[in-house]
């Protein structure tokens, strides 16, 4: 398992969120998730301007093994999507916590962050899944 950046929060479904200034939340999937999925071949991105509720399906990623929904960790409006993924979905495999981000959400309820998992809590979820 790769190192999990300490500035992220997680959902049990393996999405991560990095909070920036101005209530901006960058969202992607964990290294663990991309490893489980294998080589990604397609990413269906949300539309800029879409309103997402926390826990709602925001995007879909497809690999040679399976398709998987990506859930929004927070409530808000999509203000940016990673268009690079349309041509190079494998960017998620190569750099899930960096260049492989999926979308940026302008949060409407920043307090939702407290409901998400810390890196340590997420690591515990992964370890309990392995047993």
UniProtKB/Swiss-Prot annotation:
UniProt cofactor(s): (R)-lipoate
Family: Belongs to the GcvH family.
Keyword Transmembrane: no
Keywords: Lipoyl
Subunit-structure text: The glycine cleavage system is composed of four proteins: P, T, L and H.
GO annotation terms (biological process): glycine decarboxylation via glycine cleavage system
Origin superkingdom: Bacteria
Record PROSITE patterns: BIOTINYL_LIPOYL, LIPOYL
InterPro entries: 2-oxoA_DH_lipoyl-BS (IPR003016), Biotin_lipoyl (IPR000089), GCV_H (IPR002930), GCV_H/Fam206 (IPR033753), GCV_H_sub (IPR017453), Single_hybrid_motif (IPR011053)
Gene: gcvH
Name of the molecule in the record: Glycine cleavage system H protein
Pfam families given in the database record: GCV_H
Residue span(s) of domain Lipoyl-binding: 24-106
Task performed by this protein: The glycine cleavage system catalyzes the degradation of glycine. The H protein shuttles the methylamine group of glycine from the P protein to the T protein.
Cellular component GO terms, alphabetical: cytosol; glycine cleavage complex
Cofactor: binding details: Binds 1 lipoyl cofactor covalently.
Record-linked SUPFAM superfamilies: Single hybrid motif
Record carries keyword Secreted: no
């Amino acid at each position: 398992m790769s190192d999990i950046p300490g500035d992220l929060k997680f959902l049990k479904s393996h999405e991560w969120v990095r909070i920036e200034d101005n209530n901006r939340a960058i969202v992607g999937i964990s290294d663990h998730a991309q490893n489980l999925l294998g080589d990604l071949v397609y990413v269906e991105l949300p539309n800029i301007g879409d309103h997402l509720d926390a826990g709602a399906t925001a995007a879909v990623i497809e690999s040679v093994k399976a398709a998987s929904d990506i859930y929004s960790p927070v409530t808000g409006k999509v203000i940016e999507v990673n268009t690079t993924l349309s041509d190079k979905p494998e960017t998620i495999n190569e750099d899930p916590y960096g260049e492989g981000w999926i979308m940026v959400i302008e949060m409407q309820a920043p307090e939702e962050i407290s409901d998400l998992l810390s890196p340590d809590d997420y690591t515990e979820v992964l370890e309990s899944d392995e047993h």
